[in-house]
Amino acid sequence: MSGNKDKSKRGRSNKLPFILMGGHICVDVAQGGLASVLPFLVIQSGFSYTEITALVLASNVASAVIQPLFGLMGDKKARPWLMSVGVALAGLGIALVGVLQSYWLVVLAAMVSGIGNAMLHPEGARLAYLAGGDDKAMSMSIFSVGGQIGFCLGPIISVAAVTAFGLSGTLVYLALCLPYALVLLALSRRFLAFGVRGGGSLAGRGKRDRWGAFGVVLGALSVRSIVFYGVTSFFPLYLVATFNAAEDSASLLITVFSIFGAMATASAGFASRRVPAPRLMIGCFVLMVASLASFLLSGSVWLCVAAVMVLAMCLNLFNPPAVALAQEYLPEHLGTASGLAFGVAVAVGGIASPMLGALGDSAGLASAIWVLAALAAAGLAFSLGVAAIERRGARKG
């Protein structure tokens, strides 16, 4: 009888990562859709390029900087209501971006959307980790792929809605996000049952935080973020400048990158069952260095596209297991670990991107991409460090 109860409980827990994935889709639909609203703001509201760039920066900074704070709140007391409020604010913020007239109110609305995004990630990732049971990397993979689905759907929804209804079409995000916020709110009691850290012990490890080990994983995740931003920012421009590719054709490269990245994220949980996270990280960074070099040296558009496919797989295949490992290193601060992994690591990529852009302006895009290859080599060094930490832990265990 008790065996049936355990099986039923596991079944309910196994559904929770998909429910959390839905929340992740909602907040990243809003964040992904913001960029596609910008051209309409320039044309219909008369904002300058500088003003709309500041708009995106305000949203991203608000999201990235405040995420660890919400993670710390979750470490002190389980607050699953943060997710429902976060989904509601993410949708409300971008909905108001299209209807407000004052520029500074639009900036404030973008920041509200970013804060909503920040509210979901730490608590959602913490609960995905706890709901994962013995297969935490799979649970994190399910949660993470929601973000990529959201980023893919956001631009489609924004363009379709604003084209059909004008800037007030952004109100569609209320219809998307508010109902799901209510779903998450209704499930708060079930989420509360996991507590702050869950009831189980960490297999093969003590329960003390290991900040040094966490920092090494965070270094690898930060490198991943910089390379990710670099690929999406510079690779289409490189194809246009080097091979005279049409701008719309070069932009399709990002679609290919997104599709293969989503496939890799969805496969990450299965990969982690066969390959330990440190080995997966090492393999991905080795292929990353090779792919970046191949992109520059190939001399063929199609080989460049193939290199981008491999890069997309490498950048996303190791990410959910690495985030789960980072959380495992901070068992007493799961929310903080989640906030740093999803917030600060991503912010590093956003901060580095303009610096790489300045290098591209002064020394050429190829130089910027070679820097990405060097950074990927640094990511390999971080990954080797993680593997060494795991070996030491195994010997002590």
State where each predicted segment sits.
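Residue-level signature of mid-helix packing/kink "hotspots" within the transmembrane helices
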Residues: 32, 60-68, 151-152, 258-266, ...
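Extracytoplasmic gate region of multi-pass secondary transporters
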Residues: 34-35, 212-262
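Helix-to-loop junctions at the C-terminal end of transmembrane segments
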Residues: 66-78, 264-276, 360-361
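Cytoplasmic helix-loop-helix junction between adjacent transmembrane helices
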Residues: 109-146
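Helix-loop-helix hairpin linking two adjacent transmembrane segments in secondary transporters
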Residues: 143-190
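C-terminal transmembrane helical hairpin of 12-TM major facilitator-type secondary transporters
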Residues: 276-322
